[in-house]
Structure formats: structure tokens, C-alpha cells
A protein has these predicted regions:
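Structured functional modules or segments
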Residues: 593-667
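Conserved bacterial/organellar gene-expression machines centered on ribosome-associated P-loop NTPases
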Residues: 398-404, 409-419, 590-604, 608, ...
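N-terminal beta-alpha lobe that positions the nucleotide/phosphoryl donor
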Residues: 1-274, 278-297
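Catalytic cores of soluble metabolic enzymes centered on carboxylation/carboxyl-transfer
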Residues: 259, 298-531, 622-625, 659-661, ...
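Short amphipathic alpha-helical segments
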Residues: 166, 243, 389-395, 597-599
Length: 667
């Protein structure tokens, strides 16, 4: 059996591998860059080796440095995780040459499936359904436009060595094909060191459904069911689930059989994933094969009861699979939400900074027979760096059925506290309660269709306003009673805490009276409605759980001056709790207007300016590219919002900018 595993990765996947290895009695070695000296995976491993500067090109994907770490520690096996070197055939070959076990598939399979053009040809020969397209390399932008026109728009422009949403663009016309070709080429070169591009037909309104395969070195290959990965943004998965709410048993069987056939065609062993796009008639087409463990593997583990990392280790050690295809059953439903360091209110742009607060919900069994799991690689006080992928954690919920899993996830998101960075928790909550998502009627266009103007938060309806008003009154009442008991203010004076309040949210006012009702508290509203409440706010707490109207409510609470900031279910409001008299006077107060930035192009994310496309005095049209910013390994194009004249260019290529720093100024 393997005795020591070096994990050629970082963050949550490194911690994930360490957890299984520890349970199996196998020692682990972490590697780390300058940016990760204090990282969780470094502390969790039995040993840790420094491998270089923060940029991944000089550390996590520097094969010679990984090999040096292997020699230094005497590791007899390497788990590559996902990303970085996980699908690098040269790395796997170097390990073979060094006599080190690669916990993954054979080199030949990595080569065959790692090239998107070759993989599609092999898939077609293996009888796997494929999408029409141009499988030869594209020379330049003009050829990209010509071929796209021949295939028929829309088309998907993709990096041959791509993955993770990088190096991919959808084009609907010749202009977008030319621009998309160059952007895909640049991203592919930066992310994978390989800028080869191909083009295929884009299937409109598709679902993204993938099949998990697992094979051993003795010729057995099985499939472990599917994962629904259609909730995507910019081709990057955000929410996954297993099984899919769309597949019927016949389609599931057919997809599984084709995935196994493809794996056998390349003599595959270890865990791998065959991705398909599926149209509304359940026709499915091969997309790509990922020759590694997927980010979203936990949902498969939760519904099958298997530990995929353990299976990978056992297969790498030469063991045969201990179960057959008929032994694989899907029990219940699992949902995964990816917590990203990104600002949903700024079009999901990357965010960096220190985690001043990181309190995930408790893992394990919950009420109603459900289960929570949180895979993470960070701790409170840790830093989210601009050098790596912005994923902070993967929160997973299992339930006996789909809605039970979704509701468990929704409550867990309510309880998840993250401060110090921008993050997508509010957006995840919004999706979980969206009726279209809950019904299972989803495609890869879900986010674009349901949030066409980006995410601006969830607007409270009348019922939500009542719940938030009740929370605000409960919090305010505790603070008032606490203040009333402070000694030494005025001698022989008994302060009476009022019971009648007016709660203001922006332009909405709600009259509320708080009353004791046995062991519960009753909030009566001015319109005659009422809510019973249970639960206590502890002064200084940033989160509180109540039962309001019979339903559990977990709210994040911040006291900011005279306001109580409440965040719940994607809503973010400031509540002002005042006496009726003060509320009447407050209506006459003037409101401060935000500064005018309409004549500035501000950097929407921390990153590096890679190109400036205009100069001072130039007239630009709406939608015209002005500059590009590279952040988190992604290239982002900044465009003109309207017709304008450039007054001043404030930066030059190579400049590192923080959020909201000026890029251009307009007349």
C-alpha cells in the first residue's frame, strides 16, 4: 500500500485529500508557495515543503520543483488534485520515470483526452455522440470568423487544452468570433501554456450533465451516475447536484454506457468525468473528458456513499474495484454551492483580501434527516490571494429528496458567515429560493436569463419585510433593555423601555409593537398582522437564529451607527428602529447623494492592466473595448457604456490596480 502521498495542489482539494489519507493511515506532504505559508493545507499535512514564489508558474505548475519536493520527502505517490498539473501528461510521465505512483489515469489517457480535438475524434470512434464542429486548429481571427459562418452561429470558441471555463467564448456573429478567438487564445496561453483553438456548434438552451466514471488497472470501468452542472456563470460551474432532475432512467443508462465506452477506449483507470451537453429532447453530445477528480465530486460521494479519493488511492496502488456496476445505487439527493471570493453586486468580479470572519455552518446531520458537508481550505484570518482560483469553500447538502436538500442548503447559507471579502453567498441564496431552480427547469442560460442585469440583491416582499422588521425590533429591544440596566447614569431613575416602534427600510415604514406571549414574543404590526417569535439576540453577536412565524430564520446582523444591517436570503437591508415621534421627525431629514462617477472608467476588480485600446482625445462608441484587466487568471474586457471622448488615460499596461481605481477619464 502507498505510504506517503505528496499533494501537488493547494487549498480545499489538498485538505480533502489529506482527510482521506489520514483516515487510511497514509502520511501526507503539502507543497506551498510564498502566498500560502500559513495556509490550512500546510498546517493539516504531516510535512510541508516550500516550492517557490506566489505565481503558480513558479510554484504549483513548476514540475521540477514538485519533483524536488518528492525527492526531499521520500513520497512514493502524488495526488494532483484538480487544476494545476492534474491533467498534465508531461508531469505524469515524469513521475513514472522517477518511479513515483501517479494517483490518476495513465499518461496515454491524459494525452488523448487532454486535447479537445483528439478527444472528440476518439469519442466519435468509440460510438459517443458528438457536437458538429471544426476539429482542426484555427490559424487566426479571420479564419475563426469564416469557419464559424460555415458551421452556423452561434458557435463555441474553445481552447484545445482548456477547462474550468477558461479559454471559452460564445460568438453570435463574425465580430464576436474574431474578438472571442483572440480572448480565448490569450486566456488559454496564460492558463495552460497552450493557445490552440477550435470551434464547434453551440447548442442553445443546453443542460450541462456529466457522468462520473471509475476504473481500475484490471480492466473494470464503472459509472457512478450523473451530476447536473447547468447553473453556470461564464462557463464556470456555480451550483451542482446529483442526480439530475432531468434525466430519465433510459437516458442515464445510455449516457453511462457511452462514458464507460470512451474510458475503455483509452484504457482508463482512476476517477474521471465525461461531460455532455443535453438538449430539451434529452439528446446528449460529448463535450470533454476530465482526467482528474472534479471540483463537484462531493455530491456523487453523498449519493453513492463512496469516497472517490480513497478509490483513486486504492486503484493507484493496484487494487481491483471491490464492487460492480449493479452495486452502484443513488440514494437521496445532494446539492453543492461553490462559495467564491467575488462581488455579485459588481458583475461577480473577483475579490481579494483577508477573511476577517469565516464561520461555516456545522457539518454533519441536521434536522429532518439531512446532512451538511463543507469542503474548504481556508480559516478565519486567512488571505484570499489574486494569484489563484477565487473559490473559498464548497458547501454541500444531502437530503432524502431534492427539495429537502435545497431547503437544507438554504438554511446553511443563512448561517454561513464570511466577512472581509466580497462573496457570492447572497446570490447562492437567491438561486436556492428561485422557483425555476426549485422546479428543476434549468439550462446553462439560467443565470443569464433570470439575472440579465446582473445580481442586485433580492428585494424584500411584504412577507420578508415583516420578518426583517420583527428581527430588527427584537435586536433593538435587547439593546434598549441592556442600556436601561447600565448603572450610574441617573440616580434613583427607572428607565422604561418602550414597546411601540417604527421600522424603516429605505422608503418602507412598518409600525410594530412588541409583546410578551408566554415563552414567545409577539410582534404586532400596524396593519393588524402579527408574528410570533422565539430566539434571543446576544449583544455583540454578528449572527442570530430565530423562529419567526413557525419558520427558522438565520440572520446576519451588523450594528452600524443608528442602523441595524440585516442580511438574509440574498436580502441586504438597513433597518432604522425609532419611536413613533422620532420616526415622524426623521421623514424630514435630507439624504446624502452618492458621488458622480459617470465620467470615469473605474477598475471593477483588483488586477493587472494588460492592454489599453484607446488614447486621449479619441471618440469611443457604446460597447467599444477600452482596456483589459487580468484577474484570477481570467481576462476581462472593459467597455464603453456610452458614446464619449477620452480625456485622459490614467494607467498603462502592466499597472496593478485595486478596485475602483481610475483607468480612464472622459470629457
Amino acid at each position: 500500500m502507498i505510504k506517503k502521498i505528496l499533494i501537488a495542489n493547494r487549498g480545499e482539494i489538498a485538505c480533502r485529500v489529506i482527510r482521506t489519507a489520514r483516515r487510511m493511515g497514509i502520511r501526507t506532504v503539502a507543497v506551498f508557495s510564498d502566498a500560502d505559508r500559513e495556509a490550512l493545507h500546510v498546517r493539516e499535512a504531516d510535512e510541508a515543503v516550500h516550492i517557490g514564489p506566489a505565481p503558480s508558474s513558479q510554484s504549483y505548475i513548476a514540475i521540477d520543483r514538485i519533483l524536488d519536493a518528492i525527492r526531499t520527502t521520500g513520497a512514493d505517490a502524488v495526488h494532483p488534485g484538480y487544476g494545476f498539473l492534474s491533467e498534465n501528461a508531461a508531469f505524469a510521465a515524469a513521475l513514472d520515470a522517477a518511479g513515483v505512483i501517479f494517483i490518476g489515469p495513465p499518461v496515454g489517457a491524459i494525452k488523448a483526452m487532454g486535447d479537445k480535438i483528439t478527444s472528440k475524434k476518439i469519442a466519435a470512434e468509440a460510438g459517443v455522440s458528438t457536437v458538429p464542429g471544426h476539429m482542426d486548429l484555427i490559424a487566426d481571427a479571420d479564419e475563426a470568423a469564416r469557419i464559424s459562418g460555415e458551421i452556423g452561429y452561434p458557435v463555441m470558441i474553445k481552447a484545445s487544452a482548456g477547462g474550468g471555463g477558461k479559454g471559452m467564448r460564445i460568438a453570435w456573429n463574425d465580430a464576436e468570433a474574431r474578438e472571442g478567438f483572440q480572448s480565448s487564445k490569450n486566456e488559454a496561453k496564460a492558463s495552460f501554456g497552450d493557445d490552440r483553438i477550435f470551434i464547434e456548434k453551440f447548442v442553445t438552451q443546453p443542460r450541462h450533465i456529466e457522468i462520473q466514471v471509475l476504473g481500475d488497472r484490471h480492466g473494470t470501468v464503472l459509472h457512478l451516475g450523473e451530476r447536473e452542472c447547468s447553473i453556470q456563470r461564464r462557463n464556470q460551474k456555480v451550483i451542482e447536484e446529483a442526480p439530475s432532475p432531468f434525466l430519465d432512467p433510459e437516458t442515464r443508462r445510455a449516457m453511462g454506457e457511452q462514458a464507460v465506452a470512451l474510458a475503455k477506449a483509452v484504457n482508463y483507470h482512476s476517477a474521471g468525468t465525461v461531460e455532455f451537453i443535453v438538449d430539451g429532447a434529452r439528446n446528449f453530445y460529448f463535450l470533454e473528458m476530465n482526467t482528474r477528480l472534479q471540483v463537484e465530486h462531493p455530491v456523487t460521494e453523498l449519493v453513492t456513499g463512496l469516497d472517490l479519493v480513497e478509490q483513486m488511492i486504492r486503484v493507484a496502488a493496484g487494487e481491483a474495484l471491490s464492487f460492480a456496476q449493479d452495486d452502484v445505487t443513488l440514494d437521496g439527493w445532494a446539492v453543492e454551492s461553490r462559495l467564491y471570493a467575488e462581488d455579485p453586486y459588481r458583475n461577480f468580479l473577483p475579490s481579494i483580501g483577508r477573511l476577517t470572519r469565516y464561520r461555516p455552518p456545522a457539518e454533519g446531520p441536521t434536522g429532518g434527516g439531512c446532512v451538511l458537508r463543507n469542503d474548504t481550505g481556508v480559516t478565519e484570518g486567512g488571505e484570499i490571494s489574486m494569484y489563484y482560483d477565487p473559490m473559498v469553500a464548497k458547501l454541500c447538502a444531502w437530503g432524502p429528496d431534492r427539495l429537502a436538500a435545497i431547503d437544507t442548503m438554504l438554511h446553511a447559507l443563512d448561517d454561513f458567515e464570511v466577512e472581509g471579502i466580497g462573496h457570492n453567498l447572497p446570490f447562492l441564496s437567491a438561486v436556492m429560493q428561485h422557483e425555476r431552480f426549485r422546479s428543476g427547469n434549468i439550462t446553462t442560460a439560467f443565470i443569464a436569463e433570470e439575472f440579465p442585469d446582473g445580481f442586485q440583491g433580492v428585494e424584500p416582499d411584504a412577507d420578508a419585510h415583516r420578518v426583517l422588521a420583527a428581527v430588527a425590533v427584537l435586536v433593538h429591544q435587547v439593546l434598549q433593555e441592556r442600556a436601561a440596566h447600565i448603572s450610574g447614569i441617573v440616580g434613583h431613575h427607572r428607565r422604561v423601555v418602550a414597546k411601540d416602534w417604527v421600522v424603516r427600510f429605505d422608503d418602507t415604514e412598518i409600525e410594530a409593537t412588541i409583546e410578551a406571549l408566554g415563552e414567545e414574543t409577539c410582534i404586532r404590526f400596524g396593519d393588524g398582522g402579527m408574528l410570533t417569535t422565539a430566539g434571543v439576540f446576544v449583544p455583540g453577536a454578528t449572527h442570530a437564529r430565530f423562529v419567526i412565524g413557525g419558520e427558522p430564520v438565520g440572520v446576519k446582523i451588523d450594528l452600524t451607527g443608528s442602523a441595524i444591517r440585516l442580511r438574509w436570503r440574498g436580502m441586504d437591508v438597513k433597518a432604522y428602529v425609532r419611536s413613533p415621534r422620532v420616526a415622524a421627525l426623521a421623514r424630514w431629514m435630507l439624504r446624502k447623494l452618492p458621488p458622480d462617477t459617470s465620467k470615469l472608467l473605474l477598475c471593477p476588480m483588483p488586477g493587472v492592466i494588460t492592454a489599453i485600446m484607446v488614447s486621449a482625445g479619441e471618440t469611443v462608441e457604446a460597447g467599444q473595448p477600452l482596456a483589459t484587466v487580468e484577474a484570477m487568471k481570467m481576462e476581462n474586457i472593459l467597455r464603453a457604456e456610452r458614446r464619449s471622448v477620452v480625456k485622459r488615460v490614467a494607467v498603462e499596461p502592466g499597472t496593478s490596480l485595486a478596485v475602483d481605481e481610475v483607468v480612464l477619464e472622459f470629457e
